[in-house]
Amino acid sequence: MIDAARTMRCDLHVHSRHSGPATVPGLRHLVRECYAEPWEVRYAARERGMDLVTLTDHDSIAGALELAGLPDAFVSEEVTCLVPGGRELHLGVYDITEAQHEALQSRRRDLEALFAYTAEQRIPVCVNHPFSALTGRREDGDLPLAFRGATHLEVRNGMMSARSNDCARAAGRLARLAQCGGSDAHTLASVARAFTCVRANDRTEFLAGLRAGLTLPAGGAGTYARLTADIMRLAVLAGADQVRRVIRGEPGALPRLAALVCLAPFAVFLPLVTAAVYADEQLFAWRHYRRFAGGIERAGRRRPPLLGTPAAGASRP
């Protein structure tokens, strides 16, 4: 067990309103990825036991910069990268400057160039939710390529199923990557559901431990009920946001509100939709872990671990 008196906690995967529009086809102009203000995320994280706070908005550090002057915060982001062939991966990058953000964004369509830059700059880089279908399809070479350049692997994601997290943990043992945890919160209710622990006394020591890979993931996995509840919360927040925009007289707000009102009756089907998504996520994780592990075994490097076995060799702070 970790001695809590010698440990600092930080949710290394959390979003704010700066993550931009939803990526779901057809909803981009109606719903945002998140509606929480950076200060609200910080308050929620600290209330739930986090010692440090960072934001990992999609390809943006605007929210993180709002907190950057605080002693318990550091700047991070979630970079949307493309592997050869155009498939997406999400990478968490931590403790970066504005100049590094610009450099990362200019390289995000060339994964090898991005990894060369993070290695040169000693930027911790984590492959987030590696076995999630939400970033699109996977080819067999995508994850090995990502794992060769990353320093960490997210093995405890507060929105992903236990099976998806188990697959990530087993893959991380094969790839010998340090392990991280984060809530992947898109609503305030989910902030700090999962997090990363490092033995440290202050922010400087925490970041040094993060760079050294002396990390331990903690917290819970996602469930069908939590996923459904978060999507319902986002739907309500989307409606409230459009009402405020109409009151302010913003151009285009009224048609968007009308579109949401028209879609409202279909909310009764959301539990069915999320059930299908949740089931697909579990199948996707199992299938792609087996393909990844099979590739390792065929290459004669290591025998793949069984899912659910103790994480021997896992990173420890």
What are the residue ranges of the model-derived segments?
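Conserved catalytic scaffold of divalent metal-dependent phosphoesterases
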Residues: E77-C81, H90-D95, C126-A133
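Acidic, His- and aromatic-enriched active-site or binding-groove loops in soluble protein domains
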Residues: F74, E78, A150-M159, R203, ...
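A conserved mid-domain beta-alpha-beta active-site/ligand-binding segment of alpha/beta enzyme cores
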Residues: R199-L263
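Domain-core and long-helix interface of multi-subunit machines
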Residues: T7-R32, E98-R193, A221, A258-P305
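Short, charged, surface-exposed secondary-structure boundary motifs
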Residues: L82-L91, A162-N165, S190-A192, L207-R211
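Short, hinge-like loop/turn segments at secondary-structure boundaries
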Residues: L70-A73, L91-Y94, L143-A146, T196-A200
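An N-terminally biased module of ancient metal coordination in phosphate/nucleic-acid-related enzymes
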Residues: M1-G86, A189, Y278, Q282-P317
